[in-house]
Design a protein with these regions (language model features):
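Flexible, low-complexity junctional segments that flank or bridge functional domains
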Residues: 2-48, 59, 96, 122-129, ...
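Short, membrane-interfacial amphipathic segments enriched in basic
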Residues: 1-2, 76
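C-terminal long alpha-helix characteristic of the crotonase
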Residues: 227-228, 259-302, 414, 470-476, ...
Length: 589
């Protein structure tokens, strides 16, 4: 028996020691990666900025230590790092050109692509060259790579060029199968966010607005490619209608979509020739990560660039399956208050990429931006979306800049409550009774539908919220509420259409927004600083262990286009009942 207990004790001690050693090695690995990531890159003369167009492009990408520890490599591209890196490459005499290598590339929006493309066009003004190569070009990757001086395709490659489509998913019939109905109160003919739960197809109003903004985005894409490749817009549309994705590679060259069919090693020879180096010598390559480690000059006064992207929520929301990054009103308001009090910050650029969310949370952020505006200039730079709640928090700014392909507007709100009575009684066999002290004491119970009187109260509440929203827009844009009503009703616009109706002041990217902020603050010399400041590796490690963001990202990658319907259902019980959000997150393919 003694030997038995000794063996058990030895086994337990061995397991504990092994676990302790693994934890120590894990922490040392994290520390090593943190230190190595902070080292400044040394750029050699006659270098090339090499950009791998694969994975997702989002506003910002934080170093993911959980992904690194799992042995995976993140291919995600930060738009912030892309624009900054290309600008640094333009101004660095040691970097002679850019090499783009296209793969499975999925941007979060065409507005992000447009901003990245404009950065490449600006790079070319320096007289430096861009060479692009791809085994396969997704439509977004081709739009971006079309700026290249020379564009090559693998002899067995493909170009995906087919136009744009938006395909919302409708959940009414699926919910009905489990006895669930959605009760809705909304304001706005075009406020179609609830249609996914109450209908089985797009309304005429939503179909009209979706058609309008898809055509607007596509016109910008074809115009850009037409100018770069010297192919008419009409011809590009013919190519899309012909589904040239399945054309023979040599056809792409005949159609002038590419300059040649080459293998990777042959493209490297082209790059070496441009660098004027011998074929046997290696190319000095620099990555966006390398350039991220090179600090910009911090001469002059500071302009803060604050990134707010994701769903707008109030307080801590569940970290798992939460539609990715969140705009937490409590956190954002505190950050904005800090920027307001920071005497070193002379102006603030708010980079907003959001389809909205909680109407209450949007109002809190709106108030804090109004307070900030009293102290220093505020300029909004819109990303892929700044719609509904995203526009709500943009409205008070001194100046609003949007990309032509930004989706914005959607001025309207809705309330949505599930009726689970059918699920409980018909599917699960549950029965409910109630005792109450007052007439409406049981209001909000999901065990039965609302009474007509209860629904009338809710509708009045929604109407009041809609009037508040319009009032905020009217104040910020210096319009009458009648003028706002004419362009509201939940209507979604592209940035270029929003400019025509004065919802935005200027078309362009974040660089224009920064320049405008400097002008409003009367700054001749200035530098920018990005906020929120990325958390240190240990905080990030703890957050990822507690909030399960790592699992969220893995599920997003696994489910692909099915991730959104999954989260729509998952979030029904967690999201605020009163919402100011875009009709749906368009899966633009």
């Amino acid at each position: 028996m003694k030997d038995f207990f000794k063996n058990v004790l030895a086994t337990i001690v061995g397991i504990v020691l092994t676990g302790f050693i693994l934890v120590i090695f894990g922490l040392l690995s994290i520390i090593g990666m943190a230190i190595s990531s902070e080292k400044s890159a040394s750029i050699k003369n006659n270098s090339v900025l090499s950009i791998n167009l694969s994975g997702q492009m989002t506003e910002r990408v934080e170093d993911d230590f959980m992904t690194q520890l799992s042995g995976q490599v993140s291919n995600n591209i930060s738009l912030e790092d892309f624009i900054s890196g290309v600008r640094k490459a333009k101004n660095n005499d040691k970097i002679k050109g850019i090499y783009l290598e296209a793969g499975a590339f999925a941007p979060d929006s065409y507005a992000s692509l447009q901003a990245a493309r404009n950065a490449l066009l600006d790079f070319k003004k320096s007289g430096k060259w861009i060479v692009a190569y791809g085994d396969i070009y997704t439509q977004g990757a081709y739009y971006l790579a079309s700026v290249a001086d020379k564009l090559y395709l693998n002899p067995q490659g493909q170009i995906d060029w087919h136009g744009l489509a938006a395909q919302p998913v409708f959940l009414k019939d699926m919910l009905a199968k489990v006895g669930v109905k959605m009760q809705v109160a909304k304001v706005g003919t075009y406020k179609s966010a609830t249609e996914q739960f109450t209908g089985d197809k797009m309304s005429d109003a939503d179909r009209a607005q979706t058609t309008a903004y898809l055509n607007g985005i596509w016109q910008n894409i074809t115009k850009g490619v037409s100018e770069s490749r010297k192919i008419s817009v009409a011809t590009l549309n013919q190519y899309a209608d012909s589904l040239i994705t399945f054309a023979a590679p040599n056809e792409y060259q005949k159609l002038k979509l590419v300059d040649g069919l080459l293998y990777t090693d042959q493209v490297k020879k082209v790059v070496k020739k441009l660098l004027n180096i011998e074929e046997k010598k290696r190319i000095n390559q620099v990555s966006l990560t390398d350039l991220k480690g090179i600090d910009d000059e911090d001469d002059g006064e500071e302009i803060a660039v604050y990134y707010a992207y994701g769903n707008i929520v109030d307080g801590n929301a569940p970290g798992m399956f939460s539609q990715g990054h969140l705009i937490d009103a409590q956190v954002v308001c505190k950050d904005i208050e800090d920027l307001m009090k920071d005497k070193d910050v002379k102006a603030v650029v708010l980079r907003i990429n959001s389809g909205g969310g909680s109407a209450y949370a949007s109002e809190q952020i709106w108030h804090q931006i109004v307070e900030l505006k009293k102290v220093k200039p505020v300029v909004v730079s819109m990303g892929g979306m700044a719609a509904s709640g995203g526009y709500y928090i943009s409205a008070p700014a001194n100046w609003i800049v949007a990309e032509p392909t930004t989706l914005t507007g959607s001025i309207g709100i809705f309330g949505m409550f599930p009726d689970l009575g059918g699920l409980y009684s018909e599917k699960l066999g549950l029965k409910f009774d109630e005792v109450k002290t007052n007439k409406n004491a049981a209001f909000g119970s999901m065990t039965r539908p609302f009474t007509p009187e209860e629904m009338s109260y809710l509708e009045r509440y929604i109407d009041r919220g809609y009037k508040t929203f319009k009032n905020r827009v009217a104040q910020g844009r210096k319009m009458s509420e009648a003028q706002v009503e004419n362009i509201a009703q939940g209507h979604v616009y592209t940035g270029q259409d929003a400019f025509k109706i004065k919802l935005v002041d200027e078309l362009g990217g974040i660089e224009k927004a920064i320049a405008k902020a400097a002008k409003l603050a009367n700054l001749k010399e200035y530098h920018t600083a990005s906020y929120p400041v990325p958390v240190d590796w240990m905080t990030q490690f703890v957050n990822q262990m507690t909030q399960k963001n790592y699992l969220d990202e893995q599920l997003r990658a696994t489910l692909g286009i099915y991730y959104e319907p999954f989260t729509l259902i998952k979030d029904l019980n967690n999201q605020a009942a009163i919402q100011a959000r875009i009709p749906y997150y368009p899966n633009i393919k």
